[in-house]
Amino acid sequence: TGQRFSTGLKVMLRVSASMHPVYGFSLVVSDVNPEYTMGDLLRRRREILMRLKQEGILELNRMLPFPEVPQRIAVISARGAAGYGDFINQLYNNPSRLRFRTRLYPAVMQGVSAPSSIIAALERVMADAAMWDCVVIIRGGGATSDLSGFDTYELAANCAQFPIPIITGIGHERDDTVLDCVSHTRVKTCLLYTSPSPRD
């Protein structure tokens, strides 16, 4: 799965036992079942979505009014990320010659610190709330496990209740995260650059 071993991660392993006269008993891992781990990740994702639904906040951001063409855009992404650079290039060189104003609120977009870093970026956006029509959260493609930071309850609940519409451009077409499910509009990164307004 590409997922690093960490506390709470469930795995199914094939092991062989051995006894060494000096080092004692040991287990040697010969195989890992990735389907077992991915199944557990999907289960946790469903549990988070169910909790958000029970709390009545799952669709709050999706219900916010949205301008026909948002031109004042707060962007949350990693500084120097290729996805961010592509988005800005396409946005400012759009064929309709629309004018946009953007500002990057940098955040860590991968790993265990990603959720808290994105929440901190959202708090900075909130301090400038009157300036923005929407927030775009960009994270390009990668291994499915690299997107696990977008499947946490804390980040999802924060985004679901955020008072400005959030557009997510996370991963590839096949990738769906909890953050995608609570955002106003989800647009995969391959389409984000040509879609400044939500699609049905």
Task: For every predicted segment, state its role.
Residues 2-5:
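Short, surface-exposed secondary-structure edge patches
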Residues 8-19:
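OB-fold and OB-like beta-barrel modules that bind single-stranded nucleic acids
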Residues 13-15, 27, 102:
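Preference for bulky hydrophobic residues occupying beta-strand positions
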Residues 18-43:
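OB-fold/S1-family single-stranded nucleic acid-binding modules
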Residues 38-67:
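Short N-terminal or domain-adjacent regulatory/targeting segments
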Residues 71:
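Nucleotide donor/acceptor-binding cores
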